[in-house]
């Protein structure tokens, strides 16, 4: 009987964006803020620089969101401002070389998840998205999602799919568009400090 003495090696699993502690989402405290009509990714989460850059080829097999529990009046405001229901999906991005402001190509995206049943929880969704070394795992929010912490240290930074001149005005933010057409390129001209998008993505090595 032929056999192999080599032990099977389990594939490496990495949780992108994971930190020892997770800040509380901003709602229902005041000011209550949520992200909306945008695709974004964390550039620095206070502990790690570029926490969502994929370190090796593999697949994203799961992702989490830490969601606030806004009050009824806060939910009504976000529904009116961004649309309803609250929802999110993963975005697999690749930076376009030489572009300034930075531009990113949407390579793949996950299924849209409705968040209403999970407000006030950390929820985990399954996924099966192929990624390559150097990709960035971002978060797309077609309407709104209260997965957002604010008033943090200045080394908490995230980047958003908006033009550089459309970073702060409420009308510009409301009329912003998430990146949802696979193969498209969009500028990520807005960088926000002292804030964090509260998501993680589980990467399993291999194809």
Q: Which residue ranges define each predicted feature?
A:
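Aromatic- and Gly/Pro-enriched, solvent-exposed loop/edge beta-strand patches characteristic
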Residues: 9-32, 82-174, 178
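Compositionally biased low-complexity segments at domain edges in trafficked proteins
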Residues: 170-207
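A carbohydrate-recognition surface predominantly in extracellular/luminal proteins
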Residues: 26, 31-39, 50, 59-65
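A broad structural signal for short, well-ordered beta-strand segments within beta-sheet-rich domains
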Residues: 60-62, 106-109, 199
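Extended extracellular/luminal ectodomain segments enriched in beta-structured repeat modules
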Residues: 53-73, 134
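Short beta-strands within extracellular/lumenal beta-sheet-rich domains
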Residues: 35-55, 120-123
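Sec-dependent, cleavable N-terminal signal peptides
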Residues: 1-6
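Short consensus segments that form the blades of beta-propeller domains
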Residues: 74-84
């Amino acid at each position: 009987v032929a056999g192999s003495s080599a032990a099977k090696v389990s594939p490496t699993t990495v949780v992108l964006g994971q930190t020892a502690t997770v800040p509380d989402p901003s709602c229902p405290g005041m000011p209550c803020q949520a992200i909306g009509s945008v695709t974004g990714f964390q550039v620095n989460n206070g502990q790690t620089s570029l926490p969502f850059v994929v370190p090796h080829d593999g697949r994203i097999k799961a992702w989490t969101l830490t969601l606030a529990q806004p009050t009824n009046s806060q939910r009504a405001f976000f529904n009116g401002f961004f649309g309803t229901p609250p929802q999110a999906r993963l975005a697999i991005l690749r930076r376009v070389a030489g572009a300034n402001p930075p531009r990113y190509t949407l390579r793949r995206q996950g299924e849209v998840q409705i968040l209403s049943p999970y407000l006030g929880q950390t929820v985990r969704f399954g996924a099966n998205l192929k990624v390559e070394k150097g990709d960035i795992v971002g978060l797309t929010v077609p309407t709104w999602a209260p997965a957002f912490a604010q008033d943090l240290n200045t080394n908490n930074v995230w980047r958003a799919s908006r033009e550089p001149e459309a970073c702060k005005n409420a009308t510009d933010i409301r009329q912003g568009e998430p990146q949802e057409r696979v193969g498209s390129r969009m500028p990520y001209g807005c960088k926000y400090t002292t804030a964090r998008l509260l998501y993680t993505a589980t990467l399993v090595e291999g194809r």
